[in-house]
A protein has these predicted regions:
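Predominantly extracellular beta-rich ligand-binding scaffolds that present long acidic/polar faces
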Residues: 1-144, 157
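Surface-exposed intrinsically disordered loops and tails
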Residues: 122-133, 157-167, 205-222
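Active-site and glycan-interaction determinants of carbohydrate-active enzymes
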Residues: 137-182
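Short coil/turn segments at beta-strand junctions that form active-site/ligand-binding loops
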Residues: 27, 54-55, 194-196, 240-244
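Ser/Thr- (and often Asn-) enriched beta-sheet segments in non-cytosolic proteins
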Residues: 56-58, 86, 168, 188, ...
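Short, surface-exposed, low-complexity cationic segments
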Residues: 180-192
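Acidic Gly/Asp/Thr-rich repetitive segments characteristic of extracellular carbohydrate-active
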Residues: 172, 204-244
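Boundary/junction segments of secreted and surface-exposed precursor proteins
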Residues: 192-207
Length: 244
C-alpha cells in the first residue's frame, strides 16, 4: 500500500497505482485534500483485523477514483463511518451517504461526473519499468473537472488551527485560494494567465519585419510563432500551465 496511519493528519498527497490499497487508516486520523487513484484493492481502507471502531477518523476534500470500480473499493471498512466522509469525490459512491459527496464515473476524458485529470494512469496497480518513465502522468485538473470548487474550507481551517498545517498551497506549491474557491484533491486548478496563452499561425512570405527589440514569442497574433511544438516548448521551459 501507499500510506499507513494510526493517528495524525494525512494532507495533500497523491497516492496512485499501488498493488495494495492507497491509504490504510487505523484510527484518530484526518484525511484531507488527497488524490488517490487506481490502487489495486481500495482507495482508503481499514485493517481487516482491527477491533477499534474508528470513530475518530474523518475523510474530507479528497478524490478517490479508479477505472475499474468492480474490482476496487473506493472506501473499504467504512460501513459504520460514512457520516465521517464529507466533500469527497469517490468512484461509484452512493451520494445519499456522508455529507456533500460526489459519485464519480470510472472514466476521465468524458462529460458528466468525471475527474478530468490532465493525464492519469490507465491501469490498476503497479506499473512496471520501462513503461512507467514514458507516461507523463499528471493529476492536475482540467477546467471542466467536476472537482472544481467542491471542497469545504472549514476542514483546512481546522488543520491550520489545531495542527499548524500550512494550507496556503497545494502539493505543487500553487495557491490554494483561487477565486475564493477550493477544489477537491491535492491539486488546486490554476486558471491560465494571459501570459501563458501563446498564438500560433502560418507566417506569410511577405511577413512585415519585427521592430528592434521585438521577439516572435507568441504573445500576440502579430508576434505569433509558426509551430505548435515551439509554443509547447516555451510553456514547458516556463514550467507553466498554458494554452496554444
Amino acid at each position: 500500500g501507499g500510506i499507513y496511519s494510526e493517528a495524525g493528519v494525512v494532507f495533500d498527497n497523491v497516492v496512485y497505482n499501488n498493488n495494495g490499497g492507497g491509504i490504510c487508516v487505523y484510527d484518530e486520523t484526518s484525511i484531507v485534500n488527497n488524490t488517490i487513484v487506481n490502487n489495486q484493492l481500495y482507495g482508503i481502507g481499514r485493517p481487516a483485523d482491527t477491533d477499534v471502531a474508528g470513530s475518530s477518523i474523518s475523510v474530507s476534500n479528497s478524490v478517490i477514483w479508479s477505472i475499474n470500480p468492480l474490482n476496487h473499493a473506493g472506501l473499504k471498512g467504512f460501513d459504520a463511518l460514512v457520516d465521517r466522509v464529507s466533500n469527497c469525490a469517490i468512484v461509484d459512491w452512493d451520494e445519499t451517504k456522508g455529507n456533500d459527496n460526489i459519485s464519480l464515473l470510472p472514466y476521465n476524458d468524458h462529460t458528466g461526473s468525471v475527474p478530468n485529470f490532465i493525464n492519469p494512469t490507465t491501469q490498476i496497480g503497479a506499473i512496471l519499468e520501462p513503461v512507467y518513465a514514458d507516461l507523463g502522468v499528471s493529476f492536475l485538473l482540467r477546467q471542466n473537472s467536476v472537482l472544481l470548487s467542491k471542497a469545504e474550507g472549514s476542514w483546512m481551517t481546522t488543520l491550520n488551527t489545531y495542527y499548524g498545517t500550512d494550507v496556503s498551497y497545494d502539493i505543487a506549491g500553487k495557491p490554494r485560494i483561487v477565486s475564493k474557491t477550493l477544489d477537491i484533491g491535492a491539486y488546486q486548478y490554476q486558471p491560465v494567465s494571459g501570459r501563458n496563452i501563446l498564438y500560433v499561425r502560418q507566417l506569410s512570405p511577405d511577413e512585415p519585419p519585427l521592430a528592434d527589440g521585438e521577439v516572435r514569442d507568441g504573445s500576440t497574433w502579430r508576434l505569433a510563432v509558426q509551430d505548435v511544438q515551439m509554443a509547447i516548448d516555451q510553456l514547458y521551459a516556463r514550467n507553466a500551465v498554458g494554452g496554444v
